């Protein structure tokens, strides 16, 4: 969870950096990097969620939704991402999601966070996920 809160909200995270600092079970893409000098990072796991241009997800063994929600809330607060907004209609919620929330990054950008459980390679796993939606018109 620490790796998620430390790195996943950074707009400067790249696929190479994600590979170096996130646990082995992570999923990352950034189709519209914050810095023009950074290369596009195509999806490393599941296909990109429709309507998003970035995902950072960490998964680990066990059921720890409550701790995951606390981790996400603390990371959002630390980054100053505090403006609540509605999860957009039609957003593709992950199977197993037990917590979902949306926050405004700026007037044109929204991030959606999800925490939940699902079957993993050795039993139940908990996932922490943040996806950045494509810019609003």
Predicted regions and their residues:
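Short N-terminal helix-initiation segments at or just after the protein's N-terminus
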Residues: 1-3, 73, 130-134
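A charged, solvent-exposed segment within the mature domains of Sec-exported extracytoplasmic proteins
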Residues: 78-137
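Extracellular/secretory pathway and lumenal proteins
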Residues: 12, 59-60, 115
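Exposed acidic/polar residues on beta-strands and adjacent loops within beta-sheet cores, strongest
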Residues: 29, 39, 47-53, 60, ...
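Generic intrinsically disordered, low-complexity segments enriched for polar/acidic and small residues
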Residues: 25-26, 31, 57, 88, ...
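N-terminal leader/targeting segments
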Residues: 1-52
């Amino acid at each position: 969870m620490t790796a998620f809160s430390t790195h996943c909200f950074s707009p400067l995270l790249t696929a190479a950096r994600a590979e170096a600092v996130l646990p082995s079970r992570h999923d990352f893409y950034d189709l519209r990097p914050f810095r023009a000098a950074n290369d596009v990072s195509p999806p490393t796991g599941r296909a990109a969620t429709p309507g998003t241009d970035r995902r950072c997800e960490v998964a680990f063994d066990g059921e720890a939704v409550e701790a995951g929600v606390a981790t996400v809330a603390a990371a959002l607060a630390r980054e100053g991402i505090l403006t609540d907004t509605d999860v957009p209609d039609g957003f593709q919620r992950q199977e197993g999601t037990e917590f979902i929330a949306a926050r405004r990054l700026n007037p044109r950008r929204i991030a959606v966070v999800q925490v939940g459980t699902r079957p993993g390679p050795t039993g139940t796993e908990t996932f922490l996920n943040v996806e950045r939606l494509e810019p609003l018109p």
